[in-house]
């Protein structure tokens, strides 16, 4: 047993290379000669390092990321083109006022052409108004008896007047009346229709009385069927007081012969109101636009509205 221990201790000393153990091996007495190991048979032990400190992995070297060495290609200069604005649509300017030729003198000739050498188609008086179509040099173009006509544009004879427009229907009715200015008055002239839309034979646009003129322009301009006399027309439409009359209303009057009658029998005349005290009607001579006289106002009975 001692021998085995001695071999073991010596072997361990040889393996570990520990001096105290080797010294101890020398003092051990055995009955057999000491075992000698050839130098070539000694194992080579690895260097285990300091057993008290743990082995640390060496930190990995930090490497910078590969950066591209090539410069990025420059973007080509693209010209900035501003989009062209879309053209605005032409919006017609709609006037809210109607233009008229206001007559400043009595017996002003209405001529067939723009000059004194043209034939006279008729005459208008101070305070009357005509439809203004346009100015042609020193003349105003108008419509008279359904024809193109002219009056002097001299400030001594005429000027321009304005009236506020009404609805589209109202203006169409008035336009029909403007065509007929200057047409002679004939009492009892044949009507356009019988009040129910049945057209009558013998009708012509060359003569009118007050109710047949209103019947014609209301039908042509707005398709409205007025009856055949002032005393039946006054029952149509909606009643309007004097203080509320406006452009396009029909104004009904009495006269000297009917002044003392009652009901519809008082009615003896009808006119189309244009505004600012002006009416379009025909009475005793021809169709005209004129201001209401004091007498005409005194004969006013009622107004009727259709628009």
Give the ranges of each region predicted by the language model.
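Glycine-rich catalytic cores of cysteine/serine-nucleophile enzymes that process amide/ester linkages
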Residues: 123-128, 134-137, 149-153, 183-208, ...
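Low-complexity, Gly/Ser/Thr/Pro-rich intrinsically disordered linker/tail segments
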Residues: 301-307
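Boundary regions of SH3-family modules and the immediately adjacent low-complexity/disordered segments
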Residues: 26-56, 61, 67-70, 74, ...
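Beta-loop motif signature
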Residues: 34-43, 90-96, 103-137
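...with weaker cross-activation on analogous glycine-rich loops/strands in unrelated enzymes
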Residues: 174, 215, 224-289
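N-terminal capping segments
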Residues: 159-211, 219-227, 262-266
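Sec-exported extracytoplasmic/periplasmic mature domains
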Residues: 129, 135, 178-186, 215-223, ...
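Sec-dependent N-terminal signal peptides of Gram-positive bacterial secreted proteins and lipoproteins
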Residues: 3-27
């Amino acid at each position: 047993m001692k021998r085995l221990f001695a071999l073991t201790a010596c072997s361990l000393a040889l393996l570990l290379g520990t001096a105290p153990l080797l010294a101890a091996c020398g003092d051990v007495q055995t009955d057999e000669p000491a075992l000698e190991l050839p130098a070539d048979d000694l194992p080579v032990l690895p260097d285990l390092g300091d057993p008290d400190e743990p082995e640390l992995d060496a930190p990995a070297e930090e490497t910078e990321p590969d950066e591209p060495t090539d410069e990025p290609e420059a973007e080509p200069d693209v010209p900035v083109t501003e989009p062209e604005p879309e053209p605005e649509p032409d919006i017609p300017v709609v006037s809210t006022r109607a233009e008229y030729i206001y007559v400043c003198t009595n017996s002003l000739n209405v001529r067939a052409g723009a000059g004194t050498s043209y034939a006279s188609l008729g005459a208008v008086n101070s305070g009357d108004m005509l439809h203004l179509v346009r100015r042609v040099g020193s003349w105003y173009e108008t419509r008279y008896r359904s024809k193109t006509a002219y009056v002097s544009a001299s400030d001594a004879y005429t000027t321009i007047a304005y009236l506020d427009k009404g609805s589209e229907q109202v203006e169409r009715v008035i336009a029909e009346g403007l065509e007929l200015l200057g047409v002679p008055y004939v009492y009892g002239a044949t009507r356009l229709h019988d009040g129910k839309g049945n057209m009558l034979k013998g009708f012509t646009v060359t003569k009118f009385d007050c109710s047949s003129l209103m019947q014609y322009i209301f039908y042509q301009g707005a398709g409205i069927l007025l009856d055949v006399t002032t005393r039946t027309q006054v029952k149509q439409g909606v009643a309007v007081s004097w203080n509320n009359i406006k452009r396009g209303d029909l104004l009904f009057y009495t006269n000297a012969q009917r002044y003392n009658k009652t009901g519809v029998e008082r009615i003896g005349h009808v006119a189309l109101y244009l505004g600012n005290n002006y009416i379009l009607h025909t009475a005793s001579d021809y169709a005209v636009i004129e201001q209401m006289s004091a007498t005409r106002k005194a004969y006013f009975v009622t107004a009727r509205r259709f628009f």
